[in-house]
Amino acid sequence: MIRLAEITRVFRMGDQEVRALNRISLDIASGEYVSIMGPSGSGKSTLLNVIGLLDRSDSGRYELDGADVTDLSENERARVRREKVGFVFQSFHLVPRLTAAENIELPLILEGVNPAERTSRVGAALDAFDLRDR
């Protein structure tokens, strides 16, 4: 579950303050799908960056699966992001020199998954998307 309470994010540009998020509160239940829509500059990316632990709010509280993640260190944020958060960027890139299988396997290696399990997971993903020959 994601719970945001009074999340505010302000960017400073010279003497000006741009309030990208102003006291945002929301709850997203486990398994729930949410669409975030709005015009350019309305704070969508900032909100997703806070939820994805890629950015910090200036104030407010953020809970993920019941744990307060508001003030975690960078290393703790990276660990939680790796274990709990799935994030697909609008412009994402594969490693061009790697095969589809190697691109799928890379995060599993970083996660420390054993070779037999990696082979199994990579094969299942390739089959699911008909990518065996890529």
Question: Which residue stretches match the model-derived regions?
Answer:
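Conserved ABC ATPase "signature" region
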Residues: 67-68, 109-112, 116-134
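Short beta-strand immediately N-terminal to the Walker A/P-loop
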Residues: 34-35, 87
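A short, flexible loop at the N-terminus of ABC-type nucleotide-binding domains that lies
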Residues: 1-4, 10-23
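ATP-binding/catalytic-site motifs of ATP-hydrolyzing domains
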Residues: 61-63, 67
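The feature captures the beta-strand-to-loop junction immediately N-terminal to the Walker
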Residues: 37-39
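Helix-to-loop junction immediately C-terminal to a conserved catalytic motif
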Residues: 52
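ABC ATPase NBD coupling module
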Residues: 15-18, 69-86
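Short coil-to-helix segment of the ABC ATPase nucleotide-binding domain corresponding to the Q-loop/switch region
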Residues: 98-107
